[in-house]
């Protein structure tokens, strides 16, 4: 009886120590976490809005100074007002939003296709050793291959149509998404996987509840890179493969400016491509990153 009481006391002590250790770790994690509090509107404007606005204003000032200094011929470097006139004309003609929507719709649809293909492919490569040995190096090689290299064969295989555009996007984005997920899975502590298996989270259930949530940082990095590759692949395809049947996207607009020697049109297309890329990052990927950080206790919202 005394031995049983001693064992019970020791078990209780071990359990209390484990709880104390868990509480200590939770407290340390809370101290290390970055606290996010609601900031005043004036502070947000000063810290988040004013710096990029000032940077854009500085670029415009330097640009205009170069125009006044006549560092090059007018047809090589248009003035800011000439580019703005292009924006105004495109808006007045009702074509500005059409240029943007044509490219965005293609890019987002192609990226969603790449997501549907790249996610299971990445899981397969990460979890099956034979598959990783067989196609892992191929995925890495495809990721380093410039996406513009796929445009000529895609045109020959599929012709000048939207299928060709989507094929180029897939070939550029799928390897990045798959490799990002593989990197995320490789960073999962083995203890988490064993704990999930012990609790019965195996197969698809383990993948959904353990593997995917634990691999989110690497997966999200792969998604961001996959979108960047999708957007660049699409622009390359639109520039090289122009056809009246395809409509006019931002890449075709850039190529039209080159064909007509209109640098103001070229600059307009470049700025629109840049703005769309920034907008997608701010509206989609930045909120996703904050959500992942907050879910992992790296951001604490007061």
Locate each region found by the language model.
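Transmembrane alpha-helices
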Residues: 167-171, 204-237, 268
């Amino acid at each position: 009886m005394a031995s049983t009481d001693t064992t019970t006391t020791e078990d209780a002590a071990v359990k209390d120590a484990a709880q104390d250790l868990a509480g200590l770790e939770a407290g340390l994690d809370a101290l290390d976490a970055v606290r996010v509090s609601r900031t005043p509107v004036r502070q947000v404007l000063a810290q988040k809005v004013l710096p990029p606005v000032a940077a854009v204003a500085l670029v415009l000032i330097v640009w205009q100074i170069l125009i006044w200094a006549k560092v090059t011929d007018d047809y090589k470097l248009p003035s800011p007002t000439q580019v703005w006139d292009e924006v105004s004309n495109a808006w007045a003609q009702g074509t500005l939003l059409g240029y943007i929507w044509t490219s965005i719709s293609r890019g987002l649809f192609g990226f969603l296709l790449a997501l549907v293909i790249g996610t299971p492919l990445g899981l397969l490569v990460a979890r099956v050793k034979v598959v990783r040995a067989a196609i892992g190096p191929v995925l890495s090689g495809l990721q380093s291959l410039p996406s513009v290299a796929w445009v000529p064969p895609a045109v020959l295989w599929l012709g000048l149509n939207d299928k060709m555009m989507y094929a180029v996007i897939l070939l550029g984005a799928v390897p990045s998404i798959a490799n990002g997920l593989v990197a995320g899975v490789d960073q999962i502590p083995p203890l988490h996987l064993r704990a999930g298996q012990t609790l019965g989270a195996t197969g698809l259930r383990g993948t959904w509840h353990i593997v995917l949530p634990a691999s989110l940082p690497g997966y999200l990095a792969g998604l961001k890179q996959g979108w960047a590759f999708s957007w660049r692949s699409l622009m390359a395809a639109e520039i090289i493969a122009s056809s009246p049947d395809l409509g006019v996207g931002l890449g075709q607009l850039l190529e039209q400016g080159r064909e007509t020697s209109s640098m103001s049109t070229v600059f307009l297309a470049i700025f629109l491509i840049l703005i769309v890329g920034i907008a997608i990052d701010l509206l989609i990927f930045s909120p996703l990153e904050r959500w992942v950080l907050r879910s992992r206790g790296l951001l604490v919202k007061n």
